[in-house]
């Protein structure tokens, strides 16, 4: 059986991973049992990458592995712009296998699946919907969930394509020509 724990931790700034480090140092959280981190950071879109970097650096030190290994092992969903609506914080999910209790009551379960990196033109299309649906089915199986009615939360966040980093996609000529014929673009 899976034992899942959730830790909601305050975050003073996008680089503040001190509370998680404290939980690890105290033995409350085993870094090798961390299976996901969701953070709501302050700041703009750049703060999300900065926060992920800070988690990767601290966890790579605690787990004695490279940043890349941490990133491949622990999905990190970073959301920016708290904008005064909520306090910056992060949620750490841990899981480990334990012996099943005698009763069979339903309890918190967690399945994680990451799709392949989508091409820029695939976002918002049936391709993305199909990939997410397949990933949800696989995550349900991993979590031991057989009835979709027992699924209460699915987090979806597009992963940036590293091949596109710092590049804007080339404009599609067919769309530009169509827009030009409609009189939307001027020569």
PLM features per residue range, with description:
Residues 1-187:
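Terminal domain-initiation and capping elements
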């Amino acid at each position: 059986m899976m034992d899942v724990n959730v830790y909601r931790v305050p975050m003073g700034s996008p680089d503040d991973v001190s509370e998680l480090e404290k939980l690890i140092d105290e033995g409350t959280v085993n870094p090798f049992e961390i299976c996901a981190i969701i953070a709501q950071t302050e700041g703009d879109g750049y703060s999300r990458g900065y926060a992920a970097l800070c988690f990767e650096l601290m966890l790579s030190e605690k787990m004695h592995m490279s940043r890349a290994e941490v990133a491949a092992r622990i999905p990190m969903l970073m959301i920016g712009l708290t904008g005064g609506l909520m306090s910056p914080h992060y949620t750490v999910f841990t899981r480990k296998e334990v012996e099943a209790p005698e009763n069979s009551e339903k309890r918190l379960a967690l399945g994680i699946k990451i799709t392949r990196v989508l091409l820029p033109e695939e976002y918002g299309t049936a391709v993305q919907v199909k990939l997410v649906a397949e990933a949800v089915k696989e995550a349900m199986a991993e979590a031991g969930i057989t009835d979709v009615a027992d699924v209460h939360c699915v987090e979806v966040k597009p992963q940036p394509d590293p091949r596109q980093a710092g590049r804007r996609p080339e404009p599609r000529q067919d769309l530009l020509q169509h827009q030009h014929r409609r009189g939307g673009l001027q020569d």
